[in-house]
Amino acid sequence: MAGEITETGELYSSYVGLVYMFNLIVGTGALTMPKAFATAGWLVSLVLLVFLGFMSFVTTTFVIEAMAAANAQLHWKRMENLKEEEDDDSSTASDSDVLIRDNYERAEKRPILSVQRRGSPNPFEITDRVEMGQMASMFFNKVGVNLFYFCIIVYLYGDLAIYAAAVPFSLMQVTCSATGNDSCGVEADTKYNDTDRCWGPLRRVDAYRIYLAIFTLLLGPFTFFDVQKTKYLQILTSLMRWIAFAVMIVLALIRIGHGQGEGHPPLADFSGVRNLFGVCVYSFMCQHSLPSLITPVSSKRHLTRLVFLDYVLILAFYGLLSFTAIFCFRGDSLMDMYTLNFARCDVVGLAAVRFFLGLFPVFTISTNFPIIAVTLRNNWKTLFHREGGTYPWVVDRVVFPTITLVPPVLVAFCTHDLESLVGITGAYAGTGIQYVIPAFLVYHCRRDTQLAFGCGVSNKHRSPFRHTFWVGFVLLWAFSCFIFVTANIILSETKL
């Protein structure tokens, strides 16, 4: 849940943390990136991908700095509580006690740094896992906290809508193609409409909605309970994902090497930038989960370098996946879910591989859906929670899970346009989480740290982008993106 301080958990090395972060960032968004690349043109896509990767790295360092500042505040509060307990346990005050207390009160008025003793641990060590919601409560006012939760909730709703649409869409594409006249999947020149027949009198859209209903009935009830992803399930889903990505890249390279590449992507097509922007922002999203990833890292000496290395590797992977895709397949034949392009017999001869690639999103996304749903439900609870209050059983166990589950399922019922869903989620809620919230967090944490610790203090995890210019630049970029995407949507709608 976004609003709690939780246990650090089992520690792991910095390189294991690097792998975890890689797995977190490279998710569903990567499967929608090839089509977005083909639509916007390869040069525009490459430039935007690199720039958005850099901006995500900047705000990631902002969040790490805010985590360190939050830990410093918690460290000092524990010291204060310890001193208060010692004062309560002391006997009746003597003259010397009065003198000591007077000295302590004077010390309270001085910056925290001047009170610390040599040999004490660095207060900026990231030892407590302080989630983003708790950091918002520490550094923002009430309005800021509510806006933070609103942004998180909108993003999680978008996430659930994408997942709720992706699974039935994949099942529809694989099963309708396999049971129709084309037993080998989606052919390159075949254009299916939702009104085309799937099984007998059932249309493709009917099959999609049947799968959506089954998906909701099977996974929806988990929203009403607490569920967490086990380590072994995480290992299994990660293994499946990397096998699938590796197979797709190798198959695309083989086709290109044999001269069978069909793609001739344009250099630039600015009409596709809107969706590309949203997809790229969504594909670099990790800021909301950084406390869970960074805190258990045992050695944080070179944390910024490792994070930078992670981003370089992710950029290289996204580039390899997308460029092999757009030169292997024609732009108009690329599917919203890239895995579905490998349901063709002329691309993959083995039926087992075709079905594995076509259906692998079904398993991996299905295991994530309950986790995100429970996270969203808990954020709703935190948003309306009042100190010392409890929710009635009906509100806690029925109302919150229902308002969590119903909206994304309704969105998925109305559309299965995954590229647009990812684009809109990334462009709006993603911009808030990836740019706006980290920028305001680091600005307020720096101000609070200076007031509490004095001007001479140094946050050991301070971002290399420490000048206030970078905070302003990130906010200006976020505002520009919001205006651009909104204007693009309005112009696109007026043309229809």
Swiss-Prot record:
Keywords: Glycoprotein, Membrane, Transmembrane, Transmembrane helix. Signal peptide: none annotated. It holds the Pfam family Aa_trans. Residues 1-10, 58-146, 226-233, 298-306, 376-397, 443-470 are cytoplasmic. The chain crosses the membrane at residues 11-31, 37-57, 147-167, 205-225, 234-254, 277-297, 307-327, 355-375, 398-418, 422-442, 471-491. InterPro entries: AA_transpt_TM. It is found in: Membrane. Belongs to the TMEM104 family. It comes from the Eukaryota. PANTHER family: TRANSMEMBRANE PROTEIN 104, TRANSMEMBRANE PROTEIN 104-RELATED. This is Transmembrane protein 104. Glycans are attached at residue 193. Residues 32-36, 168-204, 255-276, 328-354, 419-421, 492-496 are extracellular. GO terms for cellular component: membrane. It comes from Homo sapiens (Human).
